[in-house]
Structure formats: C-alpha cells, structure tokens
C-alpha cells in the first residue's frame, strides 16, 4: 500500500523530521495548529519568487515561533542588510493578525535545489504555464535530478493535457522508487499549473537512495535538524 500513502507522512519520525515541532495543551492546540496552517500558506505563495523548498515551524515553551525557510535564493530572500526579510516577517505578522506574537524567520540555503521535490514540481508547473510540452517538461526535470545524484525520479501531470476535452494523467519514471520501503529516502511534493485550459496538477517523487544502517538514518535526521 506504499503508493496509496503520502510518502512524506509515511516516513515522518522514521527517516524524516516533522515540519512542525512543538507541544501545546488542549486549550491552545487548535490555535497553534491554525497559525501553522496560515504560516505554511503564506510561504507557499512565495515559493516561486524565492524558490522555497520547505518550511519548518518550531515553538518554544513560551510559544515563541521560529520558522526555518529552506530557499534556493538566499540572497534575494534576505535582501540588502536583511531588509527584505524584515518586510516578510512584518507581512507574516499581519497574516497571523497577532502583532504581540514573537516570531523569527531563519533562512537556510538549499545546497542541491535540483534534488528538491517541491522545487522540481514548481519547475514543471511553471513550464506548463509557459505552454511548454508536458512531456518535455517532465523529462527535463527527471534528467536534471538524475544527473545531480538522485537514484530515482517519478513525475505525473494530470488535467486537460494539450487542451483535450477529457482530463487524463501522464507520467514518467526513471531509476529506483521503492515507496513501500521505509528505509528508502523519498521526497514527495505537488504543485498546480494554472493554464488557459484549466488547472493541471503536478506530482513529483524523488528518491535519494536506500538507507542501509541505523547510523545513516540518525545522520540524516541530525543533518535535517541543522539545515
């Protein structure tokens, strides 16, 4: 049943870290969860502008929020002397509608954006919006990822492909993709392409190889925390 489950959620706590790290009492849990949703949606809108691959939210015991934003355009995200980052934090406070909240945003550089599933999905979606062939867009993304060290890549595009009346799905896969194996280091992401014929959905799976030893799992989790 590995292919029926979100590969990210399937591996949280085993070979991947959670995207939200905090604890709250029952009376505050729903409030914190709603704030997390707003934060993720806020940075989702900035994904293409700053090439944001992931967002991790952490809270301390005083409920101060630290948001780790993984971006491939670190310089653009920070701006000159951090001015752009200050503007982003201020907009985020307005989105949360709570100016008293203590919130910090830390930017982390993505070393290999070609291997990031989210950025790959957005790249395919962007090419589809530019009226590029969905076949060429997928094959280009797959070749780029494999050339940069991925052991396997799978992509699917669904919708009114080439403007046909009936929606359908077409995808490509190269290399290994063991979604049912928890040791397999797999990243999964989705994106939306808004075209003249309607919305096209994009799904991307990127495999970075199988983790053989427990020490390797611990190393990946520690590296994920440092990123």
UniProtKB/Swiss-Prot annotation:
Single annotated GO MF: mRNA binding
SMART domains: KH
PROSITE patterns the UniProt entry points to: KH_TYPE_2, RIBOSOMAL_S3
Record-annotated KH type-2 domain positions: 39-109
Entry keyword set: Ribonucleoprotein, Ribosomal protein, RNA-binding, rRNA-binding
Keyword Iron-sulfur: no
Family: Belongs to the universal ribosomal protein uS3 family.
Subunit structure, interactors included: Part of the 30S ribosomal subunit. Forms a tight complex with proteins S10 and S14.
Protein name: Small ribosomal subunit protein uS3
Organism of this sequence: Mesomycoplasma hyopneumoniae (strain 7448)
Taxonomic lineage of the native organism: Bacteria, Bacillati, Mycoplasmatota, Mycoplasmoidales, Metamycoplasmataceae
Gene: rpsC
